[in-house]
Amino acid sequence: MGSSCFPQSPLSHSLFSSSSLSSSQFTPLLFSPRNAQKCKKKMPAMACIHSENQKESEFCSRRTILFVGFSVLPLLSLRANAFEGLSVDSQVKAQPQKEETEQTIQGNAENPFFSLLNGLGVFGSGVLGSLYALARNEKAVSDATIESMKNKLKEKEATFVSMEKKFQSELLNERDIRNNQLKRAGEERQALVNQLNSAKSTVTNLGQELQKEKRIAEELIVQIEGLQNNLMQMKEDKKKLQEELKEKLDLIQVLQEKITLLTTEIKDKEASLQSTTSKLAEKESEVDKLSSMYQESQDQLMNLTSEIKELKVEVQKRERELELKRESEDNLNVRLNSLLVERDESKKELDAIQKEYSEFKSISEKKVASDAKLLGEQEKRLHQLEEQLGTASDEVRKNNVLIADLTQEKENLRRMLDAELENISKLKLEVQVTQETLEKSRSDASDIAQQLQQSRHLCSKLEAEVSKLQMELEETRTSLRRNIDETKRGAELLAAELTTTRELLKKTNEEMHTMSHELAAVTENCDNLQTELVDVYKKAERAADELKQEKNIVVTLEKELTFLEAQITREKESRKNLEEELERATESLDEMNRNAFALAKELELANSHISSLEDEREVLQKSVSEQKQISQESRENLEDAHSLVMKLGKERESLEKRAKKLEDEMASAKGEILRLRTQVNSVKAPVNNEEKVEAGEKAAVTVKRTRRRKTATQPASQQESS
């Protein structure tokens, strides 16, 4: 174990010393902070390896301390001038090592091998002498390398000075170019500022115009709301009219249903009339049989026929009087036609009234004709019966029973006929009433339909005008959009030019700042290098210390460089952020300009819309005034027509009164005819009773008919008055 330790110790010492010298001389070239960190990381691993065997480490440490002490002493004596710092460090290190060796020697004084170790130390000192010679050779090599490094530093300084001169000349040229660019940019900036001022003035003018147009727009909006309210009222009136129409149509449907029911009843009554007529035909066949039996008695009653002819002449006279009265009615109709000609606007209502009057007249004439026919037939039958009774008075006595039965059946049939005639007349009156109500409802419906057509026509006109206005609005919008697009394009071009000029100015300013900072840093570095070179020339002997200082300076410079690089990166990031903020600001300005242009467009559109709405308002006012005039004229026409209708109703009542008078006169004439008949029949005593019975029946029939006519005229007059 001991023999193995001796030869290793001087070698390790020589290597340690040579490595320490080389590291002290070549640290700025070979080692870096990263290598130092790696070595520091490796040291604890080596310490762990050596701490495995404590006893062997103690012996080795003692031996190394001794050999180091012997090897360091001659080095300190020879190289005291060149390596003062190293000698001081080695002395400082040697003192604790000697103390440790002394302590170890004192601790191990009792060791019997100490004498052998001392001998071996002397032997090792000889070996160390040879190693010392090798160390001196290495020292000479290191001195040569130091001188070569100094020469290289001088060359680098010369190149550095030349680079500084070139850099300064380039900076001057760049400054001149930048000054020219700045002048140009200033001129462009002034031009852009002038453009901006003009644009601001235009914007202010547009803002004032916008405010004025907003006021006008608000006023027009108020007017539009008023017009909309008027339209809503018109729509409500339209809805009301439609509801009234629906009600009228419902009434018409109800009346039509009633008419259908009445027609069905009339048909039933006609069927019953046909059945009764068939029964009458049967009875008439029986009467014909009796007439064949009474033909012989006709010769006796020829005298009576002459008298009856005279009565007929009187009846014809009365009929002529009736015809004269009818001619007076025709004159009244002529007057009515003249009134209708004068009132052209109320033709429709007068035509309807004339139709009603003609229908009433035809109905009255038909009634009179039917009554006359019935009277003629009854008179003929009475004459036949009287002749038959005159000739066959004897047979009548025989056949009294049969005659009484026949008369009873005849009376029953007449009563049935009268009842059915009354029902038919009532139904006819109801039909007339329903027809009148239908005609009135139709006239109302026609008026309402005309009003609806007028309102629809007005609505269509308004819709057409609104569509025209919308087309004009769209055309104005397109033209305004084109103008706004052109203005936007010009503003965008100006904004782009402004942004480019601003960016160029900012870039030039930033480059100037960066160049100034770089120049300041370069000047500071030059000053530092000059001071360091002076120190190198003055302190050539203290090269090691200066190299250490330079190392520290290099480290600090590297730190400063890293710090400066970090600052540069930060400044770049801040510059990017500022550029982004500038871009955002420019975008916001562009958006503001766009919004201003959009507001200008909206104002122009609002102005155009307001003008169009004003035109619409004027048109609507004109149309409303025209409608009011038309409505007033229609009301006046309706009032005139109503007055005419009232006059015609009064004339109709007067005519009805005259007709009643004529009917009364007819009834009185019939009474006189009956009186004459009674006088004629008073000659024949046996037939008097039967003739009286028949005259009473005829009088009852005539009274009933007059009552029917009165009842028929009363509801008609009530309807006309209603």
Swiss-Prot record:
Q: Where is this motif: Nuclear localization signal?
A: 705-712
- Where does this chain mainly localize? plastid
Which residues are exposed on the Stromal face of the membrane? Answer: 134-722
**Location relative to the cell:** Plastid, Chloroplast; Plastid, Chloroplast thylakoid membrane; Plastid, Chloroplast stroma, Chloroplast nucleoid; Nucleus
Q: Which SUPFAM superfamilies match?
A: Tropomyosin
Q: Which residues form the signal peptide?
A: none
Which biological process annotations from GO are given for this protein? starch biosynthetic process
Can you say what this protein is called? MAR-binding filament-like protein 1-1
Origin species? Nicotiana tabacum (Common tobacco)
